[in-house]
Amino acid sequence: MLKYSALFLYLIYVGGSESAHSRIVGGVPVAEEKVPYVVSIRMKEIHVCGGSILSESIVLTAAHCFDKSKGYSNYAVFAGSNRLSGGLKVEIQNITIHPKYIGPSDWWKNDLAVVKLKKPLNFSKSVRTVKIFPSYVPENETVYAYGWGKTIVPFFTLPNVLQKLETKALNLTACQKSWKEHVVESQLCLWTGHGTGVGLCKADSGGPVVYKGKLVGVISWVQVHCNTKKPDVAVRLSPYFENGLRKR
């Protein structure tokens, strides 16, 4: 059962925070031991989103990854592998959606979900937590996004091996030139540049955006059809953690 709870940010804190389609087109494969905190979230064994391990029983991902009409019993987390053909399946106890998340009509603001696992993960070299970066990423700094999203547009082709995208953090003013007021300070824009043909895509959603080895964002949405002419958008985690824990 999907849960909408005021305890949402507390759960994140004790852990360590068409439709929206978020691609890694033009990424490179990455070994599982390099990013042991990345998990695959699957519905009936089909990959739908990525996620990040915050504790032995908590995974952080995007709210839009879940269809509440299907119920949590059809979803599971797969950890410990960089391949969609592998991973240890862990059942989900509950899913807590950010209480202020609305969805497409609000441009996916607060697109965060906390997944609590039925059983704790057993940590190893391929299963580890990631810490949250506590402040803003400076403009034009290099960040990395990870996912199993579409790699070939327009075909629905998911890679078996986890992909890494090197991209840049774009400031809010520059991002709003593309997305206008739809993008706000609690969102993080990612930009690889015009004409690169590289970016995020469907099924990358929920995956981590990482800066200096720490989690700075959760992949949220991109331009429909994974058109790389506009910046990709993630949830920026730092506003949720300024001055310790702060509810938004």
Curated annotation (Swiss-Prot):
Q: Which GO terms describe its cellular component?
A: extracellular region
* Domain Peptidase S1 as annotated: residue spans: 24-248
Say yes or no: keyword Lipid biosynthesis present: no
The reply on keyword Thylakoid is no
- Catalytic residues (UniProt): H64 (charge relay system), D111 (charge relay system), S205 (charge relay system)
Disulphide connectivity of cysteines: C49-C65, C175-C189, C201-C226
What GO biological process terms does the UniProt entry carry, in alphabetical order? proteolysis
Tissues expressing the protein: Expressed in salivary glands.
Q: Which family does the entry's similarity section mention?
A: Belongs to the peptidase S1 family.
Q: What is this protein called?
A: Tabserin
The source organism is Tabanus yao (Horsefly)
